[in-house]
Amino acid sequence: MASSSSFTYYCPPSSSPVWSEPLYSLRPEHARERLQDDSVETVTSIEQAKVEEKIQEVFSSYKFNHLVPRLVLQREKHFHYLKRGLRQLTDAYECLDASRPWLCYWILHSLELLDEPIPQIVATDVCQFLELCQSPDGGFGGGPGQYPHLAPTYAAVNALCIIGTEEAYNVINREKLLQYLYSLKQPDGSFLMHVGGEVDVRSAYCAASVASLTNIITPDLFEGTAEWIARCQNWEGGIGGVPGMEAHGGYTFCGLAALVILKKERSLNLKSLLQWVTSRQMRFEGGFQGRCNKLVDGCYSFWQAGLLPLLHRALHAQGDPALSMSHWMFHQQALQEYILMCCQCPAGGLLDKPGKSRDFYHTCYCLSGLSIAQHFGSGAMLHDVVMGVPENVLQPTHPVYNIGPDKVIQATTHFLQKPVPGFEECEDAVTSDPATD
């Protein structure tokens, strides 16, 4: 098994250093970072200018209303928003009926980042609900009785690992899950998202993530997968959904994280990838865009910034002498300022950018990115930078799985005590024809 425990992370110290210098985004000269279109307007430049104007309004309002600007994470408001979401959703969420394990994961992970305990009765209810989402054929669907799909399977396994109880672990049918993964495996090393569905890098990551957490990796399950992911890296340096496609932050994270799990990071051109992802941080806003010439979006606070710890580790293993020993290779302060000033809904929850509505997806990934930006390294290299008040500090998140590092260790330790299901039987079960049995 490609053990995740080799990727060591830490729990934050009782008190983390607080950044005391003037806010980066409120410097008088910061306006010079805005887009210069050289008097040649395009649809892209017009949309970018609109976003920058909204961001500037937020920065100016913050500067006007705070004689001594101090950033505050509205923890209590976010907690109450998340707590309500676990029990009751409005009809606006009907469109996510096929994403219900995702809602469980987004909310539970947000709560663990805020260091809010999950009541036992809630944990049990989540376990029982996710068990209803599990298919008799293996994997999890987007809701009870729905077809299994790798995306909700990833979300369900992560949610159960966050709960981290024997009850939660026992929900996962590992034998059937392995059979399901084999049914999705393609000859070129890629995976379908679901039976009869599409292939892209997300599926390789989801498969590698759940297989490594639950200890069901077999000798041939990921044969050819690293090579297929490497073919998805394009001339830009990032990774597209499939070979030949445009580089995208979500796909790039999935590709690199899958290769970290498989211990095949060197399959990629890491320097080219580093240049691409660091170029995605917006100079004026401080947040990240998902693709070249796209707008800033709070969710990429994780999908893009989460790549930097993975790249740091991979380049460090190669002995790169240019690596910082105290900071990730992006502007951690600017990202924290964007999230805390521009992405918090006054009523709780976080959002894409000013003018957008809050939702649990953006709450999860904005908080995850904020955690990445606050915490650097481990052990002797531990260095935290927390913008604003000391209470803003979040729990760390594991950049491969995006759950707590302690929950990764706990889950892998638990499942390593169990044997890998007999993969020969799994292959036979997948290839057999029920009509002739």
Swiss-Prot record:
Catalytic activity as recorded in UniProt: L-cysteinyl-[protein] + (2E,6E)-farnesyl diphosphate = S-(2E,6E)-farnesyl-L-cysteinyl-[protein] + diphosphate
Q: Which residues bind (2E,6E)-farnesyl diphosphate?
A: 248-251, 291-294, 300-303
Q: What is this protein called?
A: Protein farnesyltransferase subunit beta
Query: What is this protein's function per UniProt?
Result: Essential subunit of the farnesyltransferase complex. Catalyzes the transfer of a farnesyl moiety from farnesyl diphosphate to a cysteine at the fourth position from the C-terminus of several proteins having the C-terminal sequence Cys-aliphatic-aliphatic-X.
Name the gene that codes for it: Fntb
| Residues with the Phosphothreonine modification | 436
Q: Name one GO molecular function term.
A: acetyltransferase activator activity
Q: Which GO terms describe its cellular component?
A: microtubule associated complex; protein farnesyltransferase complex
Record-marked site positions (Important for selectivity against geranylgeranyl diphosphate): 102
Native organism is Rattus norvegicus (Rat)
